[in-house]
Amino acid sequence: MKSEAKDGEEESLQTAFKKLRVDASGSIASLSVGEGTGVRAPVRTATDDTKPKTTCASKDSWHGSTRKSSRGVVRTQRRRRSKSPVLHPPKFIHCSTIASSSSSQLKHKSQTDSPDGSSGLGISSPKEFSAGESSASLDANHTGAVVEPLRTSVPRLPSESKKEDSSDATQVSQASLKASDLSDFQSVSKLNQGTPCTCIGKECQCKRWHDMEVYSFSGLQSVPPLAPERRSTLEDYSQSLHARTLSGSPRSCSEQARVFVDDVTIEDLSGYMEYYLYIPKKMSHMAEMMYT
């Protein structure tokens, strides 16, 4: 049984190999193999000589290889061997989560401006309204309603603001902005639009700019400064180390160089090396051991 199977396999190999040989005339001779096969396969000639057919055999039968046909054609990517994480650069997070009312009005304005000319000033197309209303009344009501909030929300050009009196501008901005909305730059700058900052050459009086935090860095942990008791223990440790080195026999250099380091610092160090210097975990651990 085994020998028969082997013969069959060899025959299939040879037929596959011979199928690959394309004659110059364009006919493919599929020749029979061995004496065991009784039936001779007919020789197929190309029907039209003007277009000689060149048939590409499938990849599986190249060089007589009997590869199984690949069922899943798209191969999934191999799993990463190394256990180190895929690192991404640190992100910048914008702190002002509360969108101010003015910016939302601006967004609304940009949405209402649609490409067709009828709704250029925020006038929605007359299909939405009942046919009874005349277009004139539509114009009067709708533009009057929409243009007013837009005037308050759109930041003015300097030429425009010179024309309009500054007191009116400050009143409008003061009314539209509340204390909760002062978390973004636009609103704060609008609030200070009327009167220029008076602190030139003096200590700055504009408190609102000081409280504003714009970007926070989500990378390294912000380690709080050492508490006073911790600081004192650090000083004691360094003093005792110094006294020991002076009085007793000279210690090894590594012991003299060893500094008081707590676990948090070590963790930060290793994290820094892994995530910012892209050193894999094992190596960063070794470096930690060297530093401590």
UniProtKB/Swiss-Prot annotation:
A Pfam family: DUF776
Q: Name one GO biological process term.
A: cellular response to hydrogen peroxide
**Superkingdom in the source lineage:** Eukaryota
Task: Tell me a GO cellular component.
Answer: nucleus
Region annotated Disordered sits at: 27-175
Keywords attached to this Swiss-Prot or TrEMBL record, sorted alphabetically, are: Phosphoprotein
Record has Calcium as a keyword: no
User: Which InterPro entries is this protein grouped with?
Assistant: DUF776 (IPR008494)
For the modification Phosphothreonine, which residues carry it? 143, 233
Residue stretches of biased makeup (Basic residues) = 65-83
What this protein is called in its record is Oxidative stress-responsive serine-rich protein 1
Source organism of the structure: Pongo abelii
Gene symbol of the encoding locus: OSER1
